[in-house]
A protein has these predicted regions:
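Long, low-complexity, Ser/Thr/Gly/Pro-rich intrinsically disordered segments that act as flexible linkers
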Residues: 1-270
């Protein structure tokens, strides 16, 4: 479904001030409804194989050009800090990344409230041990196009020695689906200033591009530091992938124990 077809009216075009051709589609595109997809997580056994995989994947990565035409299929690629290191990125460039990215989620468990049952020692493998070097994500608006894109990605891995696939996780949703807790997906997607489209009804004012894309001013009016050299960071972004076990019963019990009426439970849940 293109954004212009979504409930709430047609999307109005606006000025483009970011380099859409150099930004991955997944940074700006809304997931279509319905959507189908797969995350593939892999490890580089040696730098040469990792670089060869990136060379093979590069022609298949979609840019954010005309991202508002969201009803299609796109492929994106992300590299972890350990992945950049495994590729042989120079040490001075690696040190130019923020500490939070260099350390990874497991090392920042306290800041992320990952304790008790959420402690990294309980995480499903391969999460939290630094083995994930690359993530390849496929999104599509139809099962046939999803399968075709997935087959194209798997073909790039081919018989490439030196790259090990650690996990392939399928995902998706239909237009009326809600998550395990009863919430509707995609309601928190912000509009980004300079991306080429005005906000949809209810989105509020556009957020400065620098809050999401490196190389542009953020809400404070300054451009945040980027990795060195500039080509390594400009028009990129930071992303996280986490796999949760939804404890719906515990969540509903918390609502009942802390709210007296159904209306209060709804407010607390919101």
């Amino acid at each position: 479904m293109a954004l212009s077809d979504r409930p709430g009216g047609r999307l109005r075009r606006a000025a483009v001030t970011v380099e859409l051709d150099d930004i991955q589609a997944a940074v700006l595109r809304y997931r279509p409804e319905p959507y189908y997809g797969t995350h593939i997580l892999a490890h580089f056994d040696d730098a040469h194989a990792g670089r060869e995989l990136l060379r093979r994947l590069a022609p298949h990565i979609h840019s954010a050009a005309e991202w508002w035409q969201a009803g299609d299929t796109w492929i994106s690629v992300a590299l972890s800090y350990s992945g950049l290191s495994a590729l042989g990125v120079p040490e001075d460039s690696l040190r130019s990344f923020p500490d939070s990215f260099r350390q990874g989620m497991a090392a920042r468990a306290e800041q992320l409230s990952d304790y008790g049952a959420n402690d990294p020692k309980h995480w499903e493998q391969p999460f939290g041990n630094g083995d994930i070097h690359i993530g390849v994500s496929i999104f599509s608006d139809s099962p046939d196009k999803w399968r075709a894109a997935l087959a194209a990605v798997r073909h790039q891995f081919g018989e490439l020695a030196g790259v090990t696939v650690l996990m392939a996780q399928d995902f998706g949703a239909q237009p009326d689906d809600r998550n395990s807790f009863g919430y509707k997906d995609l309601i928190g997607q912000p509009a980004i200033e300079g991306s080429g489209a005005d906000p949809l009804p209810g989105q509020g004012r556009p957020i400065k591009a620098g809050e999401f894309i490196l190389g542009y001013p953020g809400e404070a009016g300054v451009t945040y530091p980027m990795p060195y050299p500039e080509v390594l960071g400009r028009n990129s972004t930071f992303a996280g992938i986490r796999k949760y076990q939804s404890r719906v019963g515990a969540f509903n019990r918390f609502l009942r124990e802390n709210a007296q009426t159904l209306e209060e439970q709804e407010l607390l849940a919101a």
